Amino acid sequence: MTAFEHDKVVPYKESGLSKKQQVAGMFDDISGKYDFLNRFLSAGTDLGWRKKAIAQLNILKPKIMLDVATGTADVAIMAYNMLKPDKITGIDISDGMLEVGRKKINKLGLQGNIELLNGDSEAISFNDNTFDAITVAFGVRNFQHLETGLQEMKRVLKPGGKLVVLEFSKPRMPFVRSLYDFYMKMVTPRMGKLFSRNRDAYKYLDESIRKFPEGKQFVAILDKLEYKSTYFKSLSLGICSIYCGTK
């Protein structure tokens, strides 16, 4: 598997823990404020991005779904409401995020439709050809080994099943890029520190976005791993992108 520059980006540079361990600990630490900060820092735009990503599955109408890096289950809940599959399983390496997600699911009475499990995207504990569709929102950037995670998701997809990835990207227009850079470098870490007491998590957000292979580069990785019918859509002047591929 190819190693990428972003694979080495970690939240806590002085830590001796692996990226996977650091990411799990980071999300455990910010789990209580994660949803609030998502809405606040994106001015609610992230909800629209998630809806557009899930809409890529409208034609497929999947019955059995996997939401990788499910976090607090925003996408799993939204996918159930939009697509009405028989079952959604969400996996994540952060118990703190999963705890928040389970409370949301229970409050909505969806515990019979959505199940959350502690699970590793690079070693998914399901058989080959299990899921009709897989979603992963703002998660692949946190994989310790990007290609390994993408290959694992392909393994558990059924033939004809579809992967939908939603991930941050970098604006191309110079003026927008300047505003974006200022916001990510100056505003986001300060707000993260103020509300979650964890500035490092939001500095990591900026660095991991900058070094992540995006756009045609990411599609090329999907192609290399033999996903079919690959494409991407740029959202909000390039701040976010949707990537899709079929097994």
Where are these regions (language model features)?
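Class I SAM-dependent methyltransferase SAM/SAH-binding core
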Residues: 64-123
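Conserved alpha-helix/loop element of class I SAM-dependent methyltransferases that forms part
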Residues: 33-36, 43-63, 78
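A short glycine-rich, Lys/Arg-flanked "PGG" loop and its adjoining helix->strand segment in the class I
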Residues: 147-159
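A short acidic, Gly/Pro-enriched loop at the edge of an enzyme's catalytic core
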Residues: 122-133
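N-terminal auxiliary segments of SAM/dcSAM-dependent transferases
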Residues: 1-25
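C-terminal lobe and adjacent flexible extensions of AdoMet/dcAdoMet transferase-like proteins
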Residues: 221-247
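Hydrophobic beta-strand segment of the Class I
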Residues: 34, 134-135
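C-terminal alpha-helical "lid/dimerization" subdomain adjacent to the S-adenosyl-L-methionine
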Residues: 166-221, 231
